Design a protein with these regions (language model features):
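Alpha-helical membrane-anchoring segments
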Residues: 1-515
């Protein structure tokens, strides 16, 4: 069930990226992947090293053309379907991991989210949990091999690591520079408002009294910081942990748009539950195992496969050890006062980190108490300004917040991060795509208009484009009854000054053409 669920997550993640890849990192996208590869390649060539080791991906070979990007997404979807139906599961998972690693490492800021890294870590671990026979059928699970058993322990550790550090960072990363919203119990009073893409249910949750928000932290910390230790207390401890983790993720699903992350976390809970504990009908319909040992790969001696997997799992253990020591030491309120990671381990982790075999996690380490939003506007005359309305982004105050997960509209997410910066900054990681977006809107680019729900300039591009920073708040129930609006907003100030189109060449007085 775990592998089948992972195949579904891969399919969702790749499909979600595919429908926007050209607009974001295609040849004419906001941040072309080809430029990223060119930049990294030149920098590393100057150091006498291939850029592959900084950004391992297939597009060093094929080039990051639109055709190559779309072909990778198409192949990834096909391989995910093979995993779901139980055919060539091992090779398909290996191909999926390579393809998604390539997409992440060429996606720039649009692919820099913790769940993308979590999917890669999960996908890498799945290579040691799956069977590599070519043919499969529905049946009861066979006995686990030694490699499977070790990998299963790693799977238990992964979900425990994810959940524990999600709770621990909320407490350990509070400092004078980062107010103690979590430790003082006020974080949930503004979480529903300030999350990147709110939902209409978040509006309702935001209206609840402060005591409720503070009380809701108790079960959250119980699930995130206590239940991870239940993983070591036998199958019933793992069963309790699985239901606790899954229950928390379902509650988050009901109030937020956190892409496929919640579903991936639920899938990660499946190895905690023994297959025999599932109803027989469900087990027979959702599990797959190999048929006999007829495929060529199945004839490989178990000893050989264990010999190949052993060093990889040892390396995985070392990287996880490095991450644990680093995270427990580097927090403002560290658990470890000294860095206990030896230099050779730091070097090893640095070499393999671009492949994301293991990572540290910690969602909502810091919180924002207000909701700034960037409002892009265009004008034909410099006096009358009309606002652009972007798909899934908070713009119109009258529009009800919607559910979009498990799809991730990544431009809408990046707008949220850019707004937190307060003002356009050329040194920011968001500067490149934002500048490109403004110029494309100014020039009336047809492709970029696919990001829009409403284009105020359908016939001719504006002469000027600007960006203002707004502060959005949820309306109160009384305000919504009176106005019908879900939001209210005020102007904070300028985010980006007016950007104009170059003046068209004018003819010389003597009619001799442009001067």
């Amino acid at each position: 069930m775990f592998l089948r669920g992972l195949g579904c997550i891969y399919l969702i993640a790749i499909l979600s990226w595919w429908i926007q890849v050209g607009l974001l990192v295609g040849e004419n996208g906001l941040q072309p992947a080809s430029r990223l590869l060119e930049f990294v390649g030149k920098n590393f060539a100057a150091e006498g090293r291939p850029g592959f080791w900084a950004l391992p991906n297939l597009f060093w070979i094929t080039g990051a053309s639109d055709f190559a990007l779309n072909t990778a997404c198409f192949a990834g979807c096909g391989l995910a379907i093979l995993v779901i139906v139980g055919r060539f599961v091992g090779p398909a998972l290996a191909g999926l991991w390579v393809i998604y690693l390539s997409l992440v490492n060429t996606g720039g800021v649009f692919m820099s989210f913790q769940w993308d890294i979590l999917l890669l870590e999960t996908g890498f671990l799945a290579l040691f949990l799956c069977r590599w026979e070519a043919k499969t059928t529905w049946a009861d699970p066979p006995p686990l091999t030694p490699v499977n058993r070790v990998a299963l322990v790693f799977a238990w550790f992964l979900i425990a690591k994810l959940m524990f550090f999600s709770g621990w960072v909320k407490l350990a990363w509070s400092s004078e520079a980062t107010p103690e919203w979590w430790t003082e119990g006020s974080a949930m009073t503004f979480h529903y408002l300030t999350q990147p893409l709110p939902t209409w249910t978040a509006w309702w949750m935001h209206q609840l009294p402060a005591w409720f928000h503070k009380a809701s932290l108790v079960p959250m910390y119980l699930v995130e910081m206590v239940l991870p230790f239940a993983v070591i207390f036998g199958r019933w401890g793992r069963l309790v942990a699985a239901f606790g983790f899954s229950g928390l993720m379902l509650l988050v699903l009901l109030t937020g748009n956190f892409t496929y992350f919640n579903w991936l976390t639920i899938v990660l809970c499946l190895p905690l539950v023994q297959d025999r504990l599932w109803p027989a009908r469900l087990r027979s319909g959702l599990s797959f195992v190999p048929v006999g040992l007829t495929a060529p790969m199945a004839r490989r001696p178990l000893l050989l496969r264990s010999a190949l997997a052993g060093p990889a799992l040892l390396g995985l253990a070392l990287v996880n050890l490095h991450i644990l020591v680093r995270d427990l030491h580097q927090a403002p309120k560290p658990f470890l006062k000294a860095d206990l990671s030896p230099g050779w381990l730091d070097s090893f982790a640095a070499v393999v980190s671009p492949f994301y075999p293991a990572s540290g996690y910690g969602l909502f380490r810091t919180m924002t108490t207000e909701r700034p939003e960037i409002l892009l506007e265009g004008s034909a005359d410099g006096t009358n300004w009309l606002a652009y309305d972007f798909a899934w982004k908070v713009d119109k105050i009258s529009e009800r917040p919607r559910f979009v997960a498990p799809h991730q509209p990544r431009l809408a997410w990046q707008f949220w991060f850019a707004a937190l910066e307060g003002r356009f900054d050329y040194r920011s990681s968001n500067a490149g795509w934002f500048e490109s977006l403004v110029l494309k809107l100014r020039d009336g680019d047809r492709e970029v208009k696919r990001f829009l729900k409403y284009d105020p300039f359908p016939d001719a591009p504006p002469r000027l484009v600007r960006a203002r920073l707004m502060r959005y708040e949820f309306t109160t129930p009384d305000e919504r009854r009176a106005t019908g609006d879900w939001w209210k907003r005020v102007v904070i100030g300028e985010y980006l000054p007016e950007v104009s189109r170059p003046a068209a060449p004018t003819a010389n007085p003597d009619g001799g053409g442009p001067p």
